[in-house]
């Protein structure tokens, strides 16, 4: 598939300005906005938009997250909130998904009318179901979700998953995709032990404090999972 005229996906910050959505792959949207491509080829232009100095962002890092994405896409493929996969190009490390024009981030941060009750329960149901399936999905943000034509919320960015009973990731992989402004998030997990980080701590802090949908954090979901 020729991607030369596809557009990079950019999320909106709190002020409505465009910025990079994540530090892992190149997100591309077809001209008709009906296909979303997750391009895990290395290197790619998108991941050097903010800076050309990313020595920890390596092909090994990109490979690891591509494989993790595919693993959890497959695990959750039958869920109503799973993305509709068109194709996975393993040779070129590209994943093609059916797209509906905007992510939840663009709806919320562009000032569109979207009553909280229309997403509040859906994101809760998604996160609780993932937890009940034994998975922590760190990518809980609005730009990691979208609404299809039936007002059903779907989730992307499955690269950010770990097992609840084995929530450990080598530090080099996390350092490879963390933005300098979010370095404190890794520090909250504590020092790496044998070069491995406990991602459960990061998930809990994200869910309880850091992830925002508009001005609403996810603490109401945190309390239901952890009873804290």
What role is predicted for each listed range?
Residues 8-75:
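ATP-binding glycine-rich loop module of kinase domains
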Residues 60-65, 74-120:
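Conserved structural core of kinase catalytic domains
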Residues 35, 81, 95, 154-157:
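Protein kinase-like catalytic core scaffold
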Residues 143-147:
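Hydrophobic residue at the +6 position relative to the catalytic HRD Asp in the kinase catalytic loop
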Residues 128-136:
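Protein kinase catalytic-loop region centered on the HRD/HxD motif
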Residues 136-137, 148-228:
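C-lobe/activation-segment region of protein kinase-like
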Residues 27-33, 98-99, 148-149:
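Active-site beta-strand termini and strand-to-loop segments that position acidic
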């Amino acid at each position: 598939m020729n991607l030369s005229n596809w557009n990079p996906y950019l999320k909106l910050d709190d002020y409505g300005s465009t910025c990079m959505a994540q530090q892992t792959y190149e997100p591309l949207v077809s001209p008709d906005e009906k296909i979303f491509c997750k391009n895990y080829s290395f290197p790619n232009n998108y991941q050097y938009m903010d800076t050309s100095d990313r020595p920890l962002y390596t092909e090994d890092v990109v490979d690891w997250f591509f494989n993790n994405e595919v693993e959890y896409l497959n695990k959750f493929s039958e869920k109503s909130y799973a993305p509709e996969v068109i194709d996975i190009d393993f040779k070129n490390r590209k994943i093609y998904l059916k797209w509906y024009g905007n992510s939840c981030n663009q709806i919320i941060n562009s000032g569109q009318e979207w009553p909280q009750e229309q997403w509040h329960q859906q994101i809760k149901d998604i996160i609780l179901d993932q937890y009940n399936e034994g998975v922590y999905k760190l990518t809980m943000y609005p730009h990691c979700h979208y609404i299809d034509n039936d007002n059903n919320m779907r989730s992307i960015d499955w690269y950010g998953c770990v097992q609840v009973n084995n929530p450990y990731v080598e530090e080099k992989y996390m350092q490879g995709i963390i933005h300098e402004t979010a370095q404190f998030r890794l520090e909250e997990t504590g020092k790496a032990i044998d070069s491995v980080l406990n991602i459960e701590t990061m998930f809990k802090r994200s869910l309880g404090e850091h992830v925002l949908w508009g001005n609403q954090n996810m603490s109401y979901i945190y309390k239901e999972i952890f009873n804290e």
